[in-house]
């Protein structure tokens, strides 16, 4: 044990050698002592190392082509949306990196403003999955919020600050890490005001929510209640800066295509105008031609649109794309169910016609890729119920008839092993 012998035995720090009279606190361990000054020094070293680790991650930011290539492994189709998202996400985190470096620079930096993303497109086409895959690749906190549950502060429903609480929870309450995360707000089209004219009456779940979202979208120091706010009014607030949080807001925007079609169709009026048939106008990708004026007419306020400068559109998935989604991505549904059956020692096979029939059903139901799993569950339910109780099945083959006519899948029996045949003959 470390001691000083002049004028009586005094305990001293095992690290710096200072006596208990020279420091404020001396903490004892098994045979060692550490003072408060050495503890502070250790904390500073740890914080510096963690900050250096964060800088390394930013330096290793993947390029747009690498981001798009990663998305290709999980999401089928939607090439335009992938390219738009890849560039927007790269620029966003490059902006954060530039902000970190400018703190150490004496020159006056050019301030880079944030570019949040608006995603348009029908349900079941991959909007949410694209955002989830991006967050997975970048290893940043990710939170999903439903805009329909939000209301203005003081009304029944969720405050917009609850969105930030979900992000903080996803970061395990590491606020610094949460401040570079991604928030995905779905169903944003449901908070559009009822008309493009400003409302005289209070619209607490529409225009009111858009107004409430403006500050956090732009970047502000927000006070977030750790337990949800309204039920616990006296709790301490968590402070979070949303300046570097990337917001991706999305919606199906049903009816927007007609607004775009009407505007695009007017180009055919007057001398020298391009004349196009109604069929040509109807068959084009309307969401790719969306302008701010269309979104205002739909019911989004100009200030809200102004904070979403990047627009990415997804299109309806055709039959060929749905078949690819079933079998090609790294975590494709077919691969997932094949693995489930492997756990029971059974091989699972889908014929090409069966996959096409599943895609046809998803198109007929209008559920897109989101409805594929439900159809697969319906098709495989009878055999998934029976297989665990049987040991005579080697293979299950799902055919077109299984999907269309509710016929049971073809079951290939397992050949008995030599020992089983010997036991049976005996």
From Swiss-Prot:
GO terms for cellular component: HslUV protease complex. One of its GO terms (biological process) is proteolysis involved in protein catabolic process. PROSITE patterns: CLPX_ZB. CDD domains: RecA-like_ClpX. GO terms for molecular function: ATP binding; ATP hydrolysis activity; ATP-dependent protein folding chaperone; protein dimerization activity; unfolded protein binding; zinc ion binding. The keyword DNA repair does not apply. Keywords: ATP-binding, Chaperone, Metal-binding, Nucleotide-binding, Zinc. Residues 1-54 form the ClpX-type ZB domain. ATP binds at residues 122-129. Pfam families: AAA_2, ClpB_D2-small, zf-C4_ClpX. InterPro entries: AAA+_ATPase, ATP-dep_Clp_protease_ClpX, ATPase_AAA_core, Clp_ATPase_C, Clp_protease_ATP-bd_su_ClpX, ClpX_bact, P-loop_NTPase, Znf_CppX_C4. The keyword Metal-binding applies. Zn(2+) binds at residues 13, 16, 35, 38. Belongs to the ClpX chaperone family. Component of the ClpX-ClpP complex. Forms a hexameric ring that, in the presence of ATP, binds to fourteen ClpP subunits assembled into a disk-like structure with a central cavity, resembling the structure of eukaryotic proteasomes. This is ATP-dependent Clp protease ATP-binding subunit ClpX. It comes from Mycolicibacterium smegmatis (strain ATCC 700084 / mc(2)155) (Mycobacterium smegmatis). The gene is clpX.
